[in-house]
């Protein structure tokens, strides 16, 4: 599997946003990334789907690289209202918990990226407090579920 380039990450973000906004179909976005940007079709589908999951605050189960996470968060912060950045951070934290439950790996660099956004002042204090409380609660629940297994 070849490494996904920054150009492919940028294109995947643009296509993912276009799908999210209803401007193009998911299949068109994937095909365009595959043909126009030489991106593996499965990776293209994962990245486009993950952009939508970030914007909607939903857990995503197909991982993407740290460079993509950094790029996606920076663009969401620039392109959308604060609530979308909050949703994206929530989605990443949910992914971290999901990944921890299936692989026993903590994804510390991804968690640090979220922490940087939470402490950077980009989000209003009330949003930072809410997201930190949610993350603490989700972590406690995951630890309890792990202990029961």
Positions of PLM-derived features:
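Short, amphipathic alpha-helical "recognition" segments used to contact nucleic acids or chromatin
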Residues: 4-27
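Long, compositionally biased low-complexity regions that are usually intrinsically disordered
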Residues: 139-146
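Helix-turn-helix/homeodomain-like alpha-helical modules used for DNA recognition
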Residues: 80-139
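Short acidic, glycine/proline-enriched loop segments that cap or flank alpha-helices
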Residues: 39-40, 57-61, 80-83
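DNA major-groove recognition helix of helix-turn-helix
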Residues: 48, 52-55
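Short Lys/Arg-enriched helix C-cap and helix-to-coil transition segments
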Residues: 56-74
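Short, basic interhelical loop/turn and adjoining N-cap
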Residues: 34-46
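General secondary-structure propensity
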Residues: 26-37, 51
